[in-house]
């Protein structure tokens, strides 16, 4: 069995000096350890409460590569179970979502209630004349399930910090999406799913820490949707400018702490500035006063930027796209993209949000394709022995971290930096090399203290 010491994790990651060895994106032994020590003990996004509003409603998803089913209980609580029959390991729930009174395995017909209990075994008296203790053979339950403002998370590790402690200061940034209006948020439409041939850490890192790429990777989109030859701005809808936000913002920051990351620009008006539909742009202006009252000016105006909750939950303010990077081996990720909107928005505005998110960040989105091409090409190159063992530079903004005095929390830097990437890989390494959560927390705290010296 390969151990963390065999893999020399801290020789692959040097966050103090800004170095990363890209073997972390290709090594199958590292990947197996990730499934155990990251996806097996971190809080992972499961579903939005709006997707399972009634008792018996269920939604099928994954925790790492483990299939799980999330179910609303009769008392309104939420449980999650390993989607695996206890008889021969067959899947017991196949539909993406729906409503049910029971889950029945198609192999031998064992049936489970929505509370996970084994309730029926075909031919039980004849097949098990010695008796079968059905209470012992219920579905394996995810022991830790908690919600944060509509987002449902699960964790296999009962020794992990609670969800709110795990989120830490990233919750302040997350609230900018979840808490703009009374009534919270909901998922609109279905789930878009597609596969990208890259390691899960590539998109997670980009959403945590990389605004820098947009100036170059998305240059063609900026040129097409940007200024006209005569110097005037093209318009997409009701008075919305398509000029890049980095040209119009008065300030910008990146947040990186506890493995999580976020980056955004300070703007002077509620303009999403990411080429959304005119109805969306108008909606942000019309609801700005309520958002400012609930969140304050900075977050109410924050309608662009990138975010990732470690390890794999990402979102983009303004475009209403929320996505999970489900790992499928060291060189493949399955993307699940949701459109998340204010519940109080009109049906017309919700449709405009869905259209905007799909156009820019759906599987054929004009920005999404740029990102996917980059990640796939990187993964191809890392098949080479020299390529996957050559150190990469992670020095942007090194030593420039600070804590702000304006109420914006956490360790921050200028938006064009790699503070969040270094923090993400530090938490990644700490998890892989630690036997307990307390050891992880101690290591992360020591790193963050060193960063802020």
From Swiss-Prot:
Residues binding Fe cation: 213, 218
Pathway membership: Aromatic compound metabolism; 3-phenylpropanoate degradation
Residues that, per the record, bind [2Fe-2S] cluster: 85, 87, 105, 108
Keywords on record: 2Fe-2S, Aromatic hydrocarbons catabolism, Dioxygenase, Iron, Iron-sulfur, Metal-binding, NAD, Oxidoreductase
One GO MF term: 2 iron, 2 sulfur cluster binding
Gene3D superfamilies in the cross-refs: Naphthalene 1,2-dioxygenase Alpha Subunit, Chain A, domain 1, Rieske [2Fe-2S] iron-sulphur domain
GO BP annotation list: 3-phenylpropionate catabolic process
Cofactor requirements of the protein: Fe cation; [2Fe-2S] cluster
Cofactor: record remark: Binds 1 Fe cation.
Main EC class the enzyme belongs to: oxidoreductase
Residue ranges constituting the Rieske domain according to the UniProt record: 44-142
Reactions mediated catalytically: 3-phenylpropanoate + NADH + O2 + H(+) = 3-(cis-5,6-dihydroxycyclohexa-1,3-dien-1-yl)propanoate + NAD(+); (E)-cinnamate + NADH + O2 + H(+) = (2E)-3-(cis-5,6-dihydroxycyclohexa-1,3-dien-1-yl)prop-2-enoate + NAD(+)
Pfam families membership: Rieske (PF00355), Ring_hydroxyl_A (PF00848)
EC number from the UniProt entry: 1.14.12.19
Top-level lineage group: Bacteria
Sequence similarity: Belongs to the bacterial ring-hydroxylating dioxygenase alpha subunit family.
Role: Part of the multicomponent 3-phenylpropionate dioxygenase. Converts 3-phenylpropionic acid (PP) and cinnamic acid (CI) into 3-phenylpropionate-dihydrodiol (PP-dihydrodiol) and cinnamic acid-dihydrodiol (CI-dihydrodiol), respectively.
Subunit record text: This dioxygenase system consists of four proteins: the two subunits of the hydroxylase component (HcaE and HcaF), a ferredoxin (HcaC) and a ferredoxin reductase (HcaD).
NCBIfam families: 3PPDioc_HcaE (NF042946)
Name of the protein in its database record: 3-phenylpropionate/cinnamic acid dioxygenase subunit alpha
Lineage: Bacteria, Pseudomonadati, Pseudomonadota, Gammaproteobacteria, Enterobacterales
């Amino acid at each position: 069995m390969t151990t963390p010491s065999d893999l020399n994790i801290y020789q692959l990651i040097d966050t103090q000096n800004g170095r990363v060895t890209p073997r972390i994106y290709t090594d199958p032994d590292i990947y197996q350890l990730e499934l155990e020590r990251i996806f097996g003990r971190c809080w992972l996004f499961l579903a939005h409460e709006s997707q399972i509003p009634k008792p018996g409603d269920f939604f099928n998803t994954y925790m790492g590569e483990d299939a799980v089913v999330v179910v609303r209980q009769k008392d309104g609580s939420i449980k999650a179970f390993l989607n695996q029959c206890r008889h021969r390991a067959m899947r017991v729930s196949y539909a993406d979502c729906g409503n049910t009174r029971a889950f029945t395995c198609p192999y031998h017909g064992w049936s489970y209630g929505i509370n996970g209990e084994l309730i029926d075994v075909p031919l039980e008296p004849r097949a098990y004349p010695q008796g079968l203790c059905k209470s012992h053979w219920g579905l394996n339950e995810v022991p830790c399930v908690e919600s944060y403002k509509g987002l449902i998370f699960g964790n296999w590790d009962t020794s992990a910090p609670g969800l709110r402690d795990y989120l830490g200061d990233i919750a302040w940034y997350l609230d900018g999406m979840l808490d703009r209006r009374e009534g919270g948020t909901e998922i609109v439409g279905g789930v878009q799913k597609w596969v990208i041939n890259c390691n899960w850490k590539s998109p997670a890192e980009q959403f945590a820490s990389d605004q820098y790429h947009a100036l170059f990777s998305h240059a063609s989109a900026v040129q097409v949707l940007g200024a006209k030859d005569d110097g005037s701005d093209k318009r997409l809808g009701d008075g919305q400018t398509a000029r890049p936000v980095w040209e119009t913002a008065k300030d910008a920051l990146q947040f990186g702490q506890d493995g999580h990351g976020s980056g955004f620009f300070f703007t002077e008006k509620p303009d999403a500035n990411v080429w959304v539909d005119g109805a969306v742009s108008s909606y942000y202006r019309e609801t700005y006063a309520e958002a400012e009252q609930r969140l304050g000016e900075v977050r109410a105006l924050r309608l662009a930027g990138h975010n990732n909750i470690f390890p794999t939950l990402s979102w983009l303010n303004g475009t209403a796209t929320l996505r999970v990077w489900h790992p499928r081996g060291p060189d493949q990720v399955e993307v699940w993209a949701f459109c998340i909107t204010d519940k109080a928005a009109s049906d017309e505005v919700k449709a405009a949000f869905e259209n905007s998110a799909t156009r820019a960040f759906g599987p054929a989105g004009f920005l999404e394709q740029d990102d996917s091409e980059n990640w796939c090409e990187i993964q191809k190159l890392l098949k080479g022995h020299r390529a996957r063992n050559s150190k990469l530079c992670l020095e942007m903004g090194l030593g420039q971290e600070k804590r702000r005095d304006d109420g914006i929390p956490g360790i921050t830097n200028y938006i064009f930096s790699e503070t969040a990437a270094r923090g993400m890989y530090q938490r990644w390494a700490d998890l892989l090399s630690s036997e307990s959560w307390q050891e992880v927390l101690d290591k992360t705290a020591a790193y963050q203290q060193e960063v802020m010296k």
